[in-house]
Amino acid sequence: MYLLAMRIIQDCRKRNTLKKIKDYYFHKAKSDGYVARSVYKLEEIDKKHSLLNRGDHVLDLGCSPGAWLQYTAEKVGEKGQVLGVDLQGVKLSLPKNFKVLQADIFDMKVQDLEINGSMIDVILSDMAPKTTGIRDADARRSFALNQKVLELSVSLLRSQGALLVKAFQGEPIEQLRREFSNSFAQVKLCKPKSSRSESVEIFLLGLNKK
């Protein structure tokens, strides 16, 4: 009985801690002027791996509601160019060197995703499949989605370019990692602090496209 009570107390403490973390990043995003807390995931990965630079050409897939676009604007500056694509619209005032298309990325031609007819430096994908609640099934759906993004990156990224995708933890992640290794000199698995610890989401980063 004592052990059961202790487990319940520990579970409650854990839930309260996770709620505080979630609330912290939610309120921080509002305070910092970002439309979503997901911006801090990209910021952490960028700071650790020097992903985004001034003047970069960036493709942001699954860009709505626009937090990653906001952060990217700060990083690439006026000389950079950014194209965002999402099934949903983005209700943000963005710099003139930014363009957002409301479309299905996989219905578009490769040339439609080029920026001013040139190759891309960085592809960001915060896309996720429709989930079922069944962990293995969701991991497989995420794997299939990211395979398509990886195929696109082969055609769109310049040599030494980078690809960041959101994935779900599970057996297929290692296969996806191996497939990334065929196209990138370095492959990293990233679990940002702002990503809830109980979440199965993880980010896969390919650096220095071969």
Label for each model-derived stretch:
Residues 9-53:
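Class I SAM-dependent methyltransferase Rossmann-like catalytic core
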Residues 55-62:
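Conserved class I S-adenosyl-L-methionine
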Residues 65-76:
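Conserved SAM-binding loop of SAM-dependent methyltransferases across substrates and taxa
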Residues 78-79, 157-161:
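Short glycine-dipeptide loop
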Residues 81-86:
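Conserved SAM-binding motif I beta-strand of class I
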Residues 90-117:
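S-adenosyl-L-methionine
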Residues 118-158, 171:
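Mobile active-site "lid"/loop adjacent to the S-adenosyl-L-methionine
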Residues 171-210:
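Class I S-adenosyl-L-methionine
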